Each structure stands twice: as structure tokens, then as C-alpha cells.
A protein has these predicted regions:
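Conserved cytosolic headpiece of P-type ATPases
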Residues: 1-792, 799-800, 813, 852, ...
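Alpha-helical transmembrane segments of multi-pass integral membrane proteins
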Residues: 750, 807-824, 854-857
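Membrane-helix interface motif
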Residues: 820-834, 900-905
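Active/binding-pocket-proximal capping segment
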Residues: 830-831, 867-871
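Helix-coil boundary and interhelical linker segments in multi-pass alpha-helical membrane proteins
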Residues: 749-759, 825-847
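Generic alpha-helical transmembrane segments
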Residues: 770, 815, 848-863
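Membrane-water interface at loop-to-transmembrane-helix junctions
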Residues: 794-814, 840-850
Length: 951
């Protein structure tokens, strides 16, 4: 049998291959894969597995490995493709606003070419519009490119190096050079570089959390096993997982995308990337604004052509109206505002890879969170010991041996025995004041407790070296070791599940000697163990006995034992998580735990962090989800106030996310393993762990938590809500002045005035000069105190809600009335007939200058007014956003330069204003602010402030 055929058969286990069912010895390769049916490698002995893959205990030859490398390709997943740089740059010009402006610029260039004589103002307009598009595209591209580069700096393919047998020699190779048939050497602490079948195993255990979400170590053996689900095959190890205990040799079955990791990668690639709420709202807004602009321009063109105006002039006029209605500064303002949110989140340890995801966080209504590493510290910790009927508290959290054991003398022998009966190692991270465990985390927790009691595990091991080991297995639920004491005698150490170990004990250590274990004593031990388990602790019993020699039968080692006591441990919650969960409740955000762990473990953690408060929360396993149709799942998600989903697969997570989205929820999903990646990509907001997360998870997510803390999500949600509020503020600010630009043009058209009250170049000066900085300052408004006490906004809520449109019309209407008044007052006061006005008439130039200055001054007061929705701006503090004041004064200063500087007067056809003119405009702006304050006061009187929060 060729190795390629063997590989194709064995790597399709999840597709119903050799592990698909009992009694199956052959399989048909999946569609599109070459190869004939092959025997299941799960049920073959090790020599037959090597033979099936045309390998040997000496590994492959270098020549054969090179041939297979050419055939199968590198052992890596395809790099994420963000597209060529130029394509992403061109994508910036596909926005509807950009398309409308590009077309407008092109038509204006054409109009300038057709004009006789050619007007410099027309060319200025065409160039200015094109410049707007280029500026917006540059800002948007720069922000996205910067975020991508930052995210890519986190990527680290693990493992880079592995040990492999080639030509009978052990070599260190890059993991990407592995091929099917290679024999790899694994030791505790190694990351598994490919999907492999073990051919040798000594006390091997793996952590499959990256694939299954289950954080408990799983024993692995080299013996044949019956066909079954691939991830449950006890003689296989998989890419992306870690060997936490023991050693072994394994033959590579699958590499790259043919691995289980690759299967999840393909599932992730097939999952559609959801558009954020803001993307949907901006798209709707762009279509509507573009439609209104085109319709208005066409209407005015149709009205003015019959009046005898030159065709080209009328066409340019209609384009000017369209330009007046399109908020040219909006894309740049939106991009920079979101970028400010990105920077604020990054300072809080949340890296956002896509700008638009910032706002989407603010609309999150459901968070589907995993458990280990996000809610907890992923560091098992012994918190209670029990010996001779007395509990002993253990202080300190995590792997750092900081803390102490209350009254350590009675439990020293318990902890010494537990430390000897362990394969884990406690090491300090180089260059950092941090500790980590190499090996099983449960054994690591016992080592830390031993150090806290004043013991040195390495010294104890040297005093009583191990001479034999009887590994843990799922039937005995025990692990035992034999040691030689300093006087030449031998003793056995055992640890395991309390009930199983208790049946093998005949005595108990009372501190003053070995006493018989009576029925009452057994009941006391069971009660103590049940009490610890009821608190959500994982409980182990520890025992020992004298033995006759270095390698006695296991029946002698694990009988007539003396019970030393119990150890209770747990993975402690992150200290900040409970407050973060409470903040989510106040904000009306529902939290659903979705984990691969056991239901009892999940519920215990959920209670500690405050996710569960009810006596009987709803708990569903992956098997139960499989039995539900969509209506049943909808009923579960709707009816359960507190919900825990346990023992779930990647497919289950995607189905749950889809069901929640179907109900109108905006869903954020957290995860760190490859098994989380499909749901991370399918969610509205995928949140991956930066420190402990896999590359696949980080690539699928749009936000990466650099500190792996759930509390950072809550902070990011608050910042996201603040960003949305700020976006709404500057939208009101920008669109209200569009009304002030459009209404005078309409008024002039329908009253027969031959010229426009404000030119297109003046409009661009306002949109891109005077208005941009105040809009940016509004986008940088600090987070308001009540931002996390309101319910999430509905998924289908329009960006331009009735309330927002009402404020735009209210403020824009006041501005429009004011600038119309000053324009027509100047025109009528001159006594010049409408027909005699030309572009160079001094009164006309003064009038259009008053219109432009009126909009600029009123926008300064408008910016102050929109800072708050209900609260008086005077209560919020006029000086609380100094950037806004500076931006407003800059805009007024720019307007003054346009009015008084001769070069700018020539460009904008303006005239100098008298001090009295400025006073009139300032009074008009103050009137606008007073009117908005009166509106807010009326709103506060009529209705109390809304309050949110879910129970």
C-alpha cells in the first residue's frame, strides 16, 4: 500500500472513514481525493501501522521524505489572504459615497472642458471633489492596513521545531517539513506537529483543548483501539494539541489541511464573515443620501434649464447641489473616529483588526464565552486539603508558589506523597516573574501546594528516587509509583479518584500513627470529598504503603493502602471577571457559556463568576443539541434566562450563533482554540485570545484580547457604545449643516434668483475645512457615565432613527432659516434687481460670504449642542472637551482668512465682513444653542431617562 493511499484514508476519519463505525475495515476515500480503500490504522498494531505507511521504526529515509514532501506539500495551513495591497486600496473606492463623488468629479471635468469661456471655479470644483475621494481612501486604507499589520505581529506558528527520526537518526526539523510516514519523538511539554498514530507511549497524556475545548488531560496509548470518532481515538494525537505528560513515538498520518486542525480551518473558511451593524447602516445611509442627492440635482436641473440659463452652467449648478447633499467629510471622520476607538481599546488590551467592528461591539446583546483561560486563569490551584478529619486552607492563586498552608504539619506527608507521585514540573519562565507547569495541570497544582507547605519536590525525589510507575488509566482511575527510601526499603505512593482509592485503603493516617479505617471513617472521608465537590472542586485522594521490592505486582501496590487525605483544587476565576459579568448584566447583555467541559465543572465556574445565579440554570450538552431541531433550539435560547452549553463541537457553536442571530441578537463569541474558529468568524464579533489563542482563532476573529481577560470584552463593549454615540453626534452635526447648505439654494431657485447663495467650492471649504476637525473632536468625546446602564440597541435599529432625523431637521432648519435671512436681507437691501446680479457683483459676494460664515459660526454652536442627547451641555461642561473648542475656533479662523485674505477671496469669490456682521452671526448661533437647550429641557420634563439591564 502506498503511503499516499494510507494517508488519504486515515486523514478522512471525520468523513466517515476507517473510524466511522465498528467492524469497518475499509473505506472509500472522500470525493475528490485519490486513493483506494485502506485498513483503519486505529485498530492495527504498531508494526502494521508503520508497514501500511511504508515506514519503519527507523523513520523515513531523507530521499523518501523529500519525495513525499514534493507530493503532499508543506505541513502548514494556508496563510490568510487579505488580498493584494492594490486590490484593498481600490476597494476603498467602491463605497457608494466615493462612487457618487468620482462620477461628479468626472462630469465636472467634462463640463470644464466644454465651457466657453472656461471658468476656473469649475476646474477647482472638479479637482476638489477628486481630492476628497483620494483623501478618504487614503485614510481608510491606512487605518485598515495598520490594524492588519498589528494583528499579524501576533501570529506564531507552533511548533516551529520538532524531533523526527530520519535514516534512523534523531533530528530536529521545522514542523512544516514533516510528511506522512515520518516518525516523530514526543516529550512532555511538546506541541504535536501533525496528526499522528502513537507507536510507543510511556504514561502519555495530551491536552486537546485547542480542538475540543476540554481542558482535562487525556491518556494516550500505543495499542490498537476499536474504530470510533477520531478525536476519541486513544492511540492518536493531533496537530495543535500538547503532550502534557509522558513520552512517545508517533507516525505521521496527516499533515497540513488534511489534519483535524485543517478540517476546522476549512470549516472556518466556509463560514461567511458577517457584516457589522454599522456596515449595514452606512450602506443604507449611503444609498438614501445618494438617491436624494441625484434626485434633487436632477429636479433642479430640470427646473433651471427652461429659464434660459446656459446648459453647462445649469449642469454645474446641479452638480453643486449634489455635492451639497453628500457629506464629503463623513468617510474620513468616520474612519478617524473608529480609529480613535481602536486606539482606546488597544490601551485596554483589546486589539481590533477591523475598524467597523469597534461600533459593532457597542451593539452586542449576547456574549457566548468559553470557560478555560477566558473566565478562569487556566492554572489549577489547590485551595483545600483534608487530613485526619480536619480541613486545611491553602492560600495563593495560580502556579506561583506564593501563599501558605494553614497548619502544614498534618498535611506534609500527604503533599510529599502527592509530589512524588507526579510527572509534572514547576518551572519559572525565563526573564519573567512567572511560573508554568510542564505536564499535567492537576499534578502541577499539587506540586505548588507542596512548595507552599515548605517542601522541595526535587529534593524529595532525590531522597526517594522512583523505581517503578503504574500509569493512570480510566478503569482504575489511579496512578501509583514505587520509591526507594534512604534506608533501602520501598514504599508506594498512589493518588486518584476518592471513591476508587478508598476501596483500596484499609487504614488512615491519624498523625500519631496508622489506624484502621472503619465504616464510619469511610463515610467521613466520602462526606468530606462530597463537600469539596459540591463547591465545584476537583478532588483527589492520596495514599501510601510499604512494599516488598522495587517492582511488585500492581495488585500489591494498590491494596492495603493507608489514606493520607484529600486535596481539593480548581481553576480559579480571573479576579476581574465577576465585576465584568455584573457590568454586562447592568448593560442588558446576556452571557451564555459555551464550552467543551463537563456540565458540573461549567456550572461551578459560572456560579463563581456570577453568570449563574438561579438554583437550576438550563444546561444542555452537545448530544442534546443534536437531538433538537431549529424550533427546539430557538425555544431553549428564548426560554432560558441562564444557559450553559457543554460538551459542544465547532458545528454546535456555529449553530447556536446562527440561531441567536436569527432572533435578532448581535452576538460576540470568545475563544482561543482552533475549534472556536468557525464560530468566531460567523459571529458578529469574534473575540480571540492573544496570549493563549491559536493562530487559526486569531485569524478568524475581528478582535484579539492581548491579556486574555473577559473584563477586556466588557470594557470594549462600553467603548464601542461610546463610539456609536459619538458617531451619532457627528452625523447630526454634519447632516444638519447640509440642510443649511441646500435650503438657500432651493429658495434662490424657486424665487427666481439667477445665482446660488453658496457655491460648490464654498461647500467643500465648509465640509472639508471648517467642519472636519469639530466632527473629529465629537468622535473623540469621552465615554459618558451612563453608557453601560442602557440596554443594547436593537439589531435592526436605524442609524438615522426618528429621534436622530428629528434633531437633524430641527437644528438644520434653524441654521437654514438664519442663513436664508442674512442672504436675502443683503440682496434686498442693495435694491439691485435679481436679473442684474452677476458673480462679480460686490453685494452678491458679500451675501455668499455671509452665508458661508453663518454656517461656520452656527456649526460651532451646533457642535456644542449635540454633545449631549438629554443633558444640558452646561451641566456636562463647556470646557470638558477642549479639542472641540479648539477645532471650532480653528474653523472660524479659517473662515476669517477666506473672508479677508486676497488670495483666498479670489478662489472663493468672497468679500470682507464688517464686525457688525460677525456679531449678527454670533447672536444667531447663540439662538440655535438656546433652542436646542430648550428642546432638551422639554424632553427631560416629559420623560425620564431610559434605564436598561437584563435580570
Amino acid at each position: 500500500m502506498s503511503p499516499e493511499r494510507a494517508r488519504q484514508g486515515t486523514t478522512a476519519l471525520h468523513d466517515g472513514g476507517p473510524a466511522a463505525g465498528a467492524g469497518t475495515t475499509e473505506q472509500t476515500p472522500p470525493a475528490g481525493r485519490p486513493g483506494a480503500p485502506v485498513p483503519s490504522v486505529l485498530s492495527l498494531p504498531a508494526p502494521a501501522v508503520l508497514a501500511a505507511l511504508e515506514s519503519s521504526p527507523r523513520g523515513l529515509t531523507a530521499a523518501e521524505a523529500a519525495a513525499r514532501r514534493a507530493r503532499h506539500g508543506p505541513n502548514e495551513l494556508p496563510a490568510a489572504s487579505h488580498g493584494h495591497v492594490w486590490r484593498r486600496l481600490l476597494a476603498q473606492f467602491t463605497d457608494l459615497f466615493a462612487v457618487v463623488l468620482l462620477v461628479s468629479s468626472a462630469i465636472t471635468f467634462l463640463a470644464y472642458w466644454l465651457e466657453r469661456p472656461r471658468e476656473p471655479a469649475t476646474l477647482q470644483l472638479a479637482v476638489a471633489i477628486l481630492g476628497v475621494v483620494l483623501l478618504n481612501a487614503a485614510i481608510g486604507f491606512a487605518q485598515e492596513y495598520s490594524a492588519e499589520r498589528t494583528a499579524e505581529s501576533l501570529q506564531a506558528m507552533v511548533p516551529h521545531i520538532c524531533r523526527v527520526l530520519r535514516d534512523g537518526e534523531r533530528r530536529e526539523l521545522s514542523a512544516r517539513d514533516l510528511v506522512p510516514g515520518d516518525v516523530v519523538v514526543l516529550e512532555a511539554g511538546d506541541a504535536v506537529p501533525a496528526d499522528c498514530r502513537l507507536v510507543e507511549a510511556q504514561e502519555a497524556a495530551v491536552n486537546n483543548a485547542a480542538l475540543t475545548g476540554e481542558s482535562d488531560p487525556v491518556t494516550r496509548i500505543a495499542e490498537p483501539v476499536p474504530p470510533g470518532p477520531p478525536l476519541e481515538a486513544r492511540n492518536c494525537v493531533f496537530m495543535g494539541t500538547d503532550l502534557v505528560a509522558g513520552t512517545g513515538k508517533a507516525v505521521v498520518l496527516a499533515t497540513g489541511t488534511a489534519t483535524e486542525f485543517g478540517r476546522i480551518f476549512r470549516l472556518t473558511a466556509a463560514a461567511p464573515r458577517q457584516r457589522t451593524p454599522l456596515q449595514r447602516q452606512v450602506a443604507v445611509m449611503a444609498r438614501r443620501v445618494a438617491g436624494v442627492a441625484l434626485a434633487t440635482g436632477a429636479l433642479l436641473f430640470a427646473v433651471r434649464v427652461p429659464s434660459g440659463q446656459p446648459f453647462v452652467d445649469t449642469f454645474v449648478f446641479a452638480l453643486g447641489v449634489m455635492v451639497a447633499l453628500v457629506p464629503e467629510g463623513l468617510p474620513a471622520t468616520l474612519s478617524v473616529s473608529l480609529a480613535i476607538g481602536v486606539r482606546r481599546m488597544a490601551r485596554r488590551q483589546a486589539l481590533v483588526k477591523q475598524l467597523l467592528a469597534v461600533e459593532a461591539l457597542g451593539s452586542t446583546s449576547v456574549i457566548c464565552t468559553d470557560k478555560t483561560g477566558t473566565l478562569t486563569q487556566a492554572e489549577m490551584t489547590v485551595v483545600q486539603l483534608w487530613a485526619d478529619g480536619v480541613p486545611h486552607a491553602v492560600s495563593g492563586v495560580g502556579y506561583a508558589p506564593d501563599g501558605e498552608v494553614a497548619d502544614p504539619a498534618p498535611v506534609r506527608e500527604l503533599l510529599r506523597t502527592a509530589a512524588l507521585c507526579s510527572n509534572a514540573r514547576l518551572v519559572r519562565t525565563a526573564g519573567r516573574d512567572a511560573w508554568r507547569v510542564l505536564g499535567d495541570t492537576t499534578e502541577g497544582a499539587l506540586l505548588v501546594a507542596a512548595v507552599k507547605a515548605g517542601l522541595d519536590p526535587a529534593e524529595e525525589e532525590s531522597r526517594a528516587p522512583r523505581v517503578a510507575e503504574y500509569p493512570f488509566d480510566s478503569e482504575r482511575k489511579l496512578m501509583s509509583t514505587v520509591h526507594r527510601d534512604g534506608d533501602g526499603t520501598y514504599f508506594a505512593c498512589a493518588k486518584g479518584a476518592p471513591l476508587e482509592l478508598l476501596t483500596r485503603c484499609e487504614a488512615v493516617d491519624r498523625g500519631d500513627g496508622r489506624k484502621p479505617l472503619t465504616d464510619a471513617g469511610r463515610r467521613g472521608v466520602i462526606a468530606a470529598a462530597d463537600g469539596m465537590a459540591g463547591r465545584g472542586l476537583r478532588v483527589l485522594a492520596v495514599a501510601r504503603r510499604q512494599v516488598s521490592g522495587p517492582r511488585p505486582p500492581i495488585s500489591d501496590v494498590e491494596s492495603e493502602l493507608t489514606l493520607l487525605g484529600l486535596a481539593g483544587m480548581y481553576d480559579p476565576p480571573r479576579p476581574e471577571v465577576r465585576d465584568a459579568v455584573d457590568a454586562c448584566r447592568r448593560a442588558g447583555i446576556r452571557i451564555v457559556m459555551v464550552t467543551g467541559d463537563h456540565p458540573l465543572t461549567a456550572e461551578a465556574v459560572a456560579r463563581r463568576v456570577g453568570i449563574v445565579r438561579e438554583t437550576a440554570p438550563a444546561v444542555a450538552t452537545g448530544t442534546e443539541l443534536d437531538a433538537m431541531d431549529d424550533s427546539g433550539l430557538d425555544a431553549l435560547l428564548t426560554g432560558a434566562r441562564e444557559l450553559l452549553l457543554c460538551r459542544v463541537t465547532p458545528e454546535h457553536k456555529m449553530r447556536v450563533v446562527t440561531a441567536l442571530q436569527r432572533r435578532g441578537e448581535v452576538v460576540a463569541v470568545t475563544g482561543d482554540g482552533a475549534n472556536d474558529a468557525p464560530a468566531l468568524k460567523h459571529a458578529d464579533i469574534g473575540v480571540a485570545m492573544g496570549a493563549s489563542g491559536t493562530d487559526v482563532a486569531r485569524e478568524a476573529a475581528v478582535m484579539v484580547l492581548l491579556d486574555d481577560s473577559f473584563a477586556s470584552i466588557t470594557t470594549a463593549v462600553g467603548l464601542g457604545r461610546s463610539v456609536y454615540r459619538n458617531i451619532r453626534k457627528f452625523l447630526i452635526y454634519l447632516f444638519s449643516h447640509n440642510i443649511a447648505e441646500l435650503v438657500p439654494i432651493l429658495a434662490a431657485t424657486f424665487t427666481g434668483f439667477p445665482l446660488v447663495p453658496i457655491t460648490a467650492v464654498q461647500i467643500l471649504a465648509i465640509d472639508l475645512g471648517s467642519d472636519v476637525l469639530p466632527a473629529l473632536a465629537l468622535g473623540a468625546e469621552p465615554m459618558e457615565p451612563d453608557v453601560m446602564t442602557s440596554p443594547p440597541r436593537p439589531r435592526r435599529e436605524r442609524l438615522f432613527s426618528t429621534a436622530v432625523m428629528g434633531r437633524i431637521l430641527f437644528l438644520g432648519g434653524i441654521q437654514a432659516l438664519g442663513v436664508c435671512a442674512v442672504f436675502f436681507w443683503h440682496v434686498h437691501a442693495s435694491g439691485i434687481p435679481y436679473a442684474d446680479f452677476t458673480r462679480d457683483t460686490p453685494v452678491y459676494r458679500e451675501a455668499i460670504t455671509m452665508v458661508q460664515a453663518g454656517i461656520v459660526v452656527s456649526q460651532f454652536f451646533n457642535a456644542l449642542a449635540v454633545r449631549t442627547d438629554r443633558q444640558s451641555v452646561f451641566r456636562a461642561g463647556l470646557l470638558s472637551n477642549p479639542w472641540l473648542l479648539a477645532a471650532g475656533f480653528f474653523g472660524i479662523g479659517l473662515m476669517a482668512a477666506i473672508s479677508y485674505a486676497p488670495p483666498l477671496q479670489a478662489v472663493f469669490r468672497t468679500a470682507p465682513l464688517a464686525p457688525a456682521d460677525w456679531a449678527v452671526l454670533a447672536a444667531f448661533g447663540a439662538l440655535l444653542l438656546a433652542a436646542e437647550e430648550l428642546r432638551k429641557w422639554t424632553l427631560r420634563r416629559r420623560s425620564p431617562a431610559p434605564k436598561g439591564g437584563r435580570p
